[in-house]
A protein has these predicted regions:
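N-terminal leader/targeting pre-sequences
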Residues: 43-72
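Secondary-structure transition motifs
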Residues: 64-174, 270-300, 314, 321-352
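N-terminal type II signal-anchor transmembrane helix
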Residues: 1-43, 357
Length: 358
């Protein structure tokens, strides 16, 4: 009897040992495989520290993802994602008979950098097909993406003063990435997000888009409220050569694209604004007389434009452009259109043509 059962027990023991060895080795195999894929990302290079597998629930966790720019001197990574959790959607598997996954990013950070005249020192994501890279990192069809306590920054390390703008506490979700075509022939994914702009101002944003198109058809909305303008002084000083002494503001953006043609607007509404302050600006030895004169001009322009009854003023800048631009992706082209519109919204300009001489 003992010999009769010894072979099955031995085989079972070998299988158990092999499974344990596979369980121990597999995370390292997956990690090295992913690092090999992330090493070749065009202008960027990625690396992860380790992988945790939970095969019993059809999930795995990626720890310590960092993506950095290869060329140029950029002191911060483009992407820093401490934890990425991917799990098969059992609801979709059971009810829709589809193998799709939900992915959650915990405490991710994305850093955009303006390098000034030296474009190699800029970091915008240009030079890499990010949809293809996401497919390498998460090789399964995604239905839903969630972001928890994320952060988005805009930096300029070479400007005077250096610029560090950010949106923190980002909570966002993207739904229906694998949506089928509806009755109207559309395939719309939905994005919803909230954050704190500059650490204090509530920001809300939403969008709908076709996940399988090249960002040619979409609708986008963003609103930030109660921005303390003094917190934008580094940005205003570096790009507009003035700073705020007081005031609060809101910003609303609405944009849409149809067949790659973008339309929309940016509308800032500023309240109780003070730009020029004699004690702060003229008596401040760190500021030149020319800087003080410029701030006085900007402050004077603000006085002319504002609604005296409500002590507020607003402007509206129309957005237009095409997302098909040479050498950059459609998404980058849209961000460029937004950036140009935002700068234009805060630049003083004449509203009527110059009168004829004589």
């Amino acid at each position: 009897m003992k010999r009769r059962y010894s072979w099955p027990i031995g085989i079972f023991a070998i299988i158990v040992v092999l499974l344990i060895a596979l369980h121990i080795a597999l995370p390292y195999v997956v990690r090295d495989y992913l690092n090999g894929k992330l090493a070749d990302m065009g202008d960027y290079r990625g690396q992860i520290t380790d992988v945790d597998l939970a095969l019993w629930r059809g999930a795995y966790k990626i720890n310590g993802l960092k993506i950095v720019k290869v060329d140029g001197k950029v002191p911060v990574p483009f992407v820093n994602a401490p934890v990425i959790d991917l799990a098969v959607s059992w609801h979709s598997l059971w009810y829709d008979h589809a193998v799709v996954a939900q992915v959650q990013f915990f405490n991710p950070e994305i850093n955009f950098v303006d390098g000034g005249p030296n474009k190699q020192n800029s970091q915008t994501g240009k030079g890499t097909d990010w949809r293809a890279q996401l497919g390498k990192l998460l090789p399964i069809t995604l239905d839903e993406v969630q972001i928890h306590d994320g952060k988005i920054t805009f930096r300029n390390f070479n400007s005077r003063p250096p610029v560090n703008m950010n949106a923190s506490n980002v909570e966002a979700s993207i739904y229906n990435l694998t949506n089928v075509v509806d009755k109207q022939g559309k395939r719309d994914a939905r994005f919803e997000g909230k954050a704190k702009l500059l650490g204090h101002a509530p920001l809300e944003t939403s969008a709908t888009f076709d996940p399988l198109s090249n960002f040619e058809d979409f609708q986008f909305r963003l609103r930030a409220r109660d921005i303390e303008l003094k917190s934008m002084n580094d940005f205003a000083s570096a790009y507009g050569k003035f700073d705020f002494n007081a005031g609060h503001g809101d910003v609303v953006i609405e944009a849409q694209a149809k067949k790659a043609q973008v339309s929309g607007y940016i509308k800032p509404l500023l309240r109780d604004v003070e730009v020029f302050n004699w004690q702060q600006d003229v008596e401040n030895k760190d500021k030149s007389i020319f800087r003080s004169v410029w701030e006085a001009i900007v402050g004077g322009t603000e006085t002319v434009l504002k609604n005296q009854a409500k002590n507020q003023f607003a402007t509206k800048v129309e957005l237009s452009g095409n997302v098909h631009q040479q050498n950059i992706s459609a998404f980058e082209a849209f961000l460029q259109i937004l950036r140009n519109g935002f700068i234009q919204a805060f630049n003083a300009r004449y509203e009527r043509p110059k009168p004829d001489a004589g």
